[in-house]
């Protein structure tokens, strides 16, 4: 039982049998439309975002398995803010504003790829990313929000999401 794993980036919910997917899959003689449908079904919640996808193909049986990764923190924050691209000058040019709860939700989604051990630490990491791309949080500079997190201002919101964090964002 020989397996081959292929990693590609696709736009959520919009994979097509054309390049790069079709030509990459055709040597393995899998049912490409089935693979595309499986990818689109699995990535539909990330529409408009570039999503890492891993396709594992059993060379003998032509069966396949699709695993979807999580988009980058930057991509998730930009989607939350409704922005198209990060700013080149985050100190002076803001591209959007999101709520603290949106930051928490991004932190939970990114749980497995962040080195943070606690929800509080993960939120502070995501706030750092928000600051670097020009997104404000509740109308404030994310650095200021990080200080408020340290001071306990957001403890009530964090405690509401603590259980979801401990389950791994499932």
UniProtKB/Swiss-Prot annotation:
One Pfam short name: Ribosomal_L11
GO biological process: translation
Protein keywords: Ribonucleoprotein, Ribosomal protein, RNA-binding, rRNA-binding
Coiled coil: none
Gene label: rpl11
Keyword Ribosomal protein on entry: yes
Species this chain originates from: Desulfurococcus amylolyticus (strain DSM 18924 / JCM 16383 / VKM B-2413 / 1221n)
GO molecular function term, any single one: structural constituent of ribosome
GO terms for cellular component: large ribosomal subunit
Protein known as: Large ribosomal subunit protein uL11
Taxonomic placement: Archaea, Thermoproteota, Thermoprotei, Desulfurococcales, Desulfurococcaceae
């Amino acid at each position: 039982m020989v397996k081959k794993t292929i990693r590609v980036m696709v736009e959520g919910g919009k994979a097509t049998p054309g390049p790069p997917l079709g030509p990459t899959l055709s040597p393995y003689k899998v049912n490409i439309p089935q693979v595309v449908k499986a990818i689109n079904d699995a990535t539909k919640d990330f529409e408009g975002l570039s999503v890492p996808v891993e396709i594992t193909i059993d060379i003998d049986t032509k069966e396949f398995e699709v695993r979807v990764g999580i988009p980058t923190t930057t991509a998730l924050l930009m989607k939350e803010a409704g922005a198209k691209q990060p700013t080149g000058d985050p100190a002076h040019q803001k591209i959007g504003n999101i709520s603290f709860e949106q930051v928490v939700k991004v932190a939970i989604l990114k749980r497995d790829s962040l080195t943070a051990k606690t929800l509080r630490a993960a939120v502070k990491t995501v706030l750092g990313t928000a600051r670097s791309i020009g997104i404000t949080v509740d109308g404030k500079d994310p650095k200021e929000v990080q200080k408020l997190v340290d001071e306990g201002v957001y403890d009530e919101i964090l405690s509401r999401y603590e259980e979801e964090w401990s389950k791994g964002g499932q």
